[in-house]
Amino acid sequence: MPSWWCCCCLVVLLYAQRMIVPSSAQNDGSDELQECPGGFCSPKYLCPNGTYNEANAQNQEIIMLRFGEEDVCQDYMQVCCSNATSMRYELVTNNEPVEYGCGISNPGGLIYQVEGNRTYAQYGEFPWVVAILEAFYSSNEQQFTYVGGGTLIHPRFVVTAAHIFNKTENLVASFGEWDMNRDENVYPKQNIDIDRTIIVHPEYNSVGLLNDIALAQLKQNVVYDKHIRPICLPNPTDRFDDQLCISTGWGIEALTSAYANVLKRVDLPVIARASCKKLFAETRLGPFFRLHKSVLCAGGEEGADMCDGDGGSGLACPNESGAYVLAGIVSWGLSCHQQNVPGAYVNVARFVTWINATIEGIL
């Protein structure tokens, strides 16, 4: 193996970390609602007359739901509702027709709104986003450790980065996830066990993170809905140079240096290979750095980057029809949010033939 790859492995920051997230058991509706002046704290979607004002919490960069100028509801996704005496948390039964085509986003989100701040995705905005979790039991209660991100491409398959899998037992794919601190959602999450056999690309190199791609096969099909839909795969010849794309995840945030609870979104330009090689050569990787053919570069703008905990998350680019295509998968980087230091993504177009052949061979 060339010596520069040994150097590279010492400085590369893997975009995969672990954190504990709450159990995904749904609220049974029996909890009492918190009182507030003139009513009760209630989810916005259940309250027709609650007040919703934008306020930016300086330290957390979270958009809060407020009653007038005072925070009266402890949960930032609730408002003070004057007629909520008999209301309880409930899930929406979706009777509207759902478009099942790939790459269809919900630009305004579904029900919840995080207004005036593009740091966070709207609820249900990117239906293909998947949280990969590891299940365990503590005090006889099921809990989850966050492993990394993934992208839904088929009712039975999630594509992600190979490097996030330290172990392959008790893994769960969580669909429809948005706020890691909330169990209640307007549309129900679907948690589906992942088969123990993670399908890693045969040429994956864990030292240099070459061909850093894997398929996670679900033990049962996920059910598509408004908030759960697949992304489109690119054609093998597709290029995304200079296109502005979107990456999402629950990794470290730029302003807080803490894990995101609400799904963050980062708008990132795709960088042409020649420019990317030049930028990396000006870093501590040095002038002899060679950019592997499996890597796509994006970012390089200060304060806009994916970071620890985002490994396996997708980079989605809109095509001419407005549908989103999976251009990249978060793989590695030298630092987070630094000017002129791009992030390294798996170039998905190079692996489309392998993805399709693998799925067809199994099914």
Swiss-Prot record:
Residues the record marks as site: Cleavage: 66-67
CDD domains: Tryp_SPc
Domain of life: Eukaryota
Record domain Peptidase S1: where: 114-360
Similarity-based family: Belongs to the peptidase S1 family. CLIP subfamily.
GO molecular function, one term: serine-type endopeptidase activity
S-S bridge residues: 36-80, 41-73, 47-81, 245-317, 276-297, 307-336
Localization annotation: Secreted
Designated name of the protein: Inactive CLIP domain-containing serine protease A8
Primary location: secreted
A Gene Ontology term for the protein's cellular component: extracellular space
SUPFAM superfamilies for this protein: Trypsin-like serine proteases
Gene (UniProt): CLIPA8
Residues annotated as glycosylated: 49, 83, 117, 166, 319, 356
Biological process according to GO: defense response to bacterium; defense response to symbiont; innate immune response; positive regulation of melanization defense response; positive regulation of protein processing; proteolysis
Cleavable signal peptide: 1-25
Entries under Gene3D superfamilies matching the protein: Trypsin-like serine proteases
Gene null: resulting phenotype: In RNAi-mediated knockdown mosquitos infected with bacteria E.coli or S.aureus, bacteria melanization, prophenoloxidase (PPO) activation, and proteolytic cleavage of CLIPA28 and CLIPC9 are impaired; however, mosquito survival is not affected. Melanization of wound surfaces is normal. Increased sensitivity to fungus B.bassiana (strain 80.2) infection characterized by reduced mosquito survival and increased levels of hyphal body colonies. Impaired melanization of hyphae, but not of germinating conidia or germ tubes, caused by a failure to recruit prophenoloxidase PPO to hyphae.
Expression induction: By Gram-positive and Gram-negative bacteria-mediated infection. By parasite P.berghei infection.
Keywords: Disulfide bond, Glycoprotein, Immunity, Innate immunity, Secreted, Serine protease homolog, Signal
